[in-house]
């Protein structure tokens, strides 16, 4: 599906700022409606490393009332978390009624990366994907609104952005060997 996208379409930063401004204002209003109606909302940002998830998240949360949302950056599971059931750590971050939970990555990369790098069998990956489907279905059945975004860039653009981040002293910390290794294996993750 992603291979059908035209990645040559661009937007200037100025055009982006103009288009996003009324949407951010609307988001602030919607957050209060969510609070008043007791709706739990899960907003998930996924995408390639260096695709801009952090920048988009920063831009979005500036409009929100900090009393009514949590932001979670999902990292690799800790030793303790690996001893627990697959989704245990994610169950702990579910928003209460009336609140937003905003995820910088979620439960998907654990399965996707393990599958792409052939660290698990296809059967094990399918079992985890089934667990994700059940988890999300339970959230939706209990009234949660789940909104998912995937920020897509080409392998070439990702490499360019990783190099740019690595070359800048103030952003070099954001890039590691795993990012470059994953970039070389881009098509394993892509399929």
List the predicted regions and their residue ranges:
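Glycine-rich phosphate-binding loop of ATP-dependent small-molecule kinases
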Residues: 1-191
């Amino acid at each position: 599906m992603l291979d059908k996208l035209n990645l040559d379409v661009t937007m200037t930063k100025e055009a982006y700022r103009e288009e996003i401004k009324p949407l951010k204002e609307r988001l602030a209003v919607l957050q209060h409606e969510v609070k008043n109606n007791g709706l739990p909302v899960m907003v998930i940002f996924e995408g390639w490393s260096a695709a801009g998830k952090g920048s988009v998240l920063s831009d979005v949360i500036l409009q929100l009332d900090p009393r009514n949302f949590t932001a979670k950056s999902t990292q690799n599971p800790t030793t303790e978390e690996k001893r627990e059931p697959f989704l245990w750590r994610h169950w702990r971050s579910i928003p209460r009624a009336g609140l937003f939970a905003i995820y910088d990555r979620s439960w998907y990369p654990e399965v996707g990366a393990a599958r792409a790098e052939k660290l698990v069998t296809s059967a094990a990956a399918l079992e985890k994907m089934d667990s994700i489907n059940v988890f999300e279905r339970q959230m939706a059945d209990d009234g949660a609104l789940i909104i998912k975004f995937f920020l897509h860039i080409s392998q070439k653009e990702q490499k360019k952005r990783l190099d740019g981040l690595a070359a800048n002293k103030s952003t070099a910390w954001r890039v590691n060997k795993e990012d470059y290794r994953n970039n070389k294996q881009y098509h394993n993750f892509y399929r």
